[in-house]
Amino acid sequence: TMATIYNYPYYPKQMERMGYTKDQDWHEFKIYIPDGVPEKHLRIGEIVKKKYGLKVMKFKNAKSIMPYAQKVFRTLNESYAPLYGFARLTQKQIDYYINMYIPMLRYDLVTLIVREEDDEVVGFGISLPNLSKAMQKAKGHLFPFGWIYLLKALKSKPKVIDLYLTGVLPEYQSKGVNALLFNDLI
């Protein structure tokens, strides 16, 4: 998962008229979450945990997640490296993002997959409640009272969540680690 910019539908035609050609396709998906975790996913998750010596970690506060913050960004840099247009984050950027965004997370919507032998992060999922309805109610304005709608949306039990960042180390991709992440989100 990678946050990207949005382009209006007429942009591609306009760019082609100007002589540009398409270099890459991007896809966005809306995933409907079932009422419960499918039995097959639970079995796959348990097999993957045993086979690779992994554990699923959840957090209650910023203090508990901070020891893993740098590791998450190392995993992000490695897992996103082959993606089109990705530039590795510098240590200065990582430090900035940790200080800026860790306090704003909903810790119950953060999942880490950690290798038990060395406590290394092999996968992560960071989600937040969808803020679209709150932004509509606030009419796109934070002040004077729009922040109340946003705060309510962030604090209440979400009906829809947005996956902000998800990544798995390349050596663990296509091995079921993503099943562990999604089992926890469901």
Regions found by a protein language model. Give the residues of each.
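Acyl-donor binding region in acyl/amide transferases
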Residues: 1-19, 24, 141-186
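Acyl-donor-binding surface of acyltransferase catalytic domains
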Residues: 1-60
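Short flexible/disordered coil segments
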Residues: 32-53, 85-93, 121, 149-154, ...
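Intrinsically disordered, low-complexity acidic/polar segments
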Residues: 38, 134-136, 175
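A conserved beta-strand-loop-helix scaffold within acyl/acetyltransferase catalytic domains
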Residues: 58-168, 183
